[in-house]
């Protein structure tokens, strides 16, 4: 079904091609004093608690149960639905010894990241560009964390391997190992604003000198022990965008982020916020407004 209040929209032509950041810091309020920061390329502005960005999605990839091909994502973008079922990701491009360390969530994230990169492995002496990767997940490997807490409650010894695989940057680290990738990466979480925060992080890296940045967003439903804390629809999914700054006259996407002193969230959505962001990137919708946790995020695109 289409998102509430939105018409069905056509899917952009070409798998792994999209539309939509460049960073400009204009003015910044710090401790009641105004500081003027260096001007960059006029595609990101920061003022007090407000942030505006413009960006291009150079390529994309996505993976979810029942939505594994470009054709299925085309159908999904035209009339979104909440993916159901358990992920079945073979991850054939990853060596068996490393592949067995990936839990289902990690397999989804790895598949999206590898699809975005074209399954290309980087040799140790490869001439790498400086393009970093941002991994963004609201919950990450919460199931592994809960298992460790259960072991501790029983008085069992904690497995160093299990602990290492439970930390928030573990999935990104294993993907880097699978690809032989020694470039910069980071892992973030920001509640329902995780996808938007991932774009902000990627754009900051572009402003720091990278020519492009990859954003990998992934999540799964909370385990049963934490299910009572779910506050939005949940599903297994992962998607990846390759982001760059827009060129002069190029059609771009925009993200406006601001703090709002309100506890009133938007109506209960049909999709989790991170899947809403993917839908907006793949569709021709002109605007998507997300409001939660004291933040208001407005996604828009050039006509």
Question: Which residues are covered by each model-predicted region?
Answer:
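Conserved "HGTGT" condensation-loop signature of ketosynthase/thiolase-family condensing enzymes
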Residues: 1-140, 144-162, 167-185, 217-303
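Active-site-proximal alpha-helical scaffold in enzymes
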Residues: 110-114, 119, 189-213
